Amino acid sequence: MKQSFETSKLYYGFPIFILGYQDQTHGYNVTTCSSSYSLGDWLVIGVGSEENAADQIKHYQKFTVNIPDESLMLEMEQAGFISHREKIAKFGLDFQPSKLTQAPILDACPVVLDCQVDRIIEEDGICHIFAKILDRLAESDLLDDRGHFKNDRFAPTYFMGDGYKRVYRYLDDRVDPMGSFIKKARKKDDKSSITT
């Protein structure tokens, strides 16, 4: 039986990413985020209104979503815990400025989304940033010979927890194609209708 529980927040599993942006003081900068969703060519991210990233993205209207794997956990944590300072050089992160947005594309992150801000809605201390995805970039070993993404090869880290404790969750290489459970159920139903 389910029961109600009190918590100030609940993160039920969101991929962690390193938000890259131009910075008026430091040239380029990064911070860690986990609040996002994507539909088609749209991406929505959430950042605290008081954060340097919010100010810089409001100014430049562009950013990158650099999605690390677990090999970059130290840098990912550092980028989130240290604020209002230059972090790219401090952590030794190699990057290239995007040709489309000039926001930093981190070499160590296997998947990157290059984004242009469409609008920002600020409410309750959070900037909800709606952006168009201008480009999707992936390491070549994550793409098959037809340029399709190899889902079983990419394992982003997920952020989960509540007001009491927050943790990182890791993916394994199991994948099931969308619709495969319905197909299995139909086959099972077909077999049972033949035998009855």
Where are these regions (language model features)?
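Basic, polyanion-binding surface patches
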Residues: 1-196
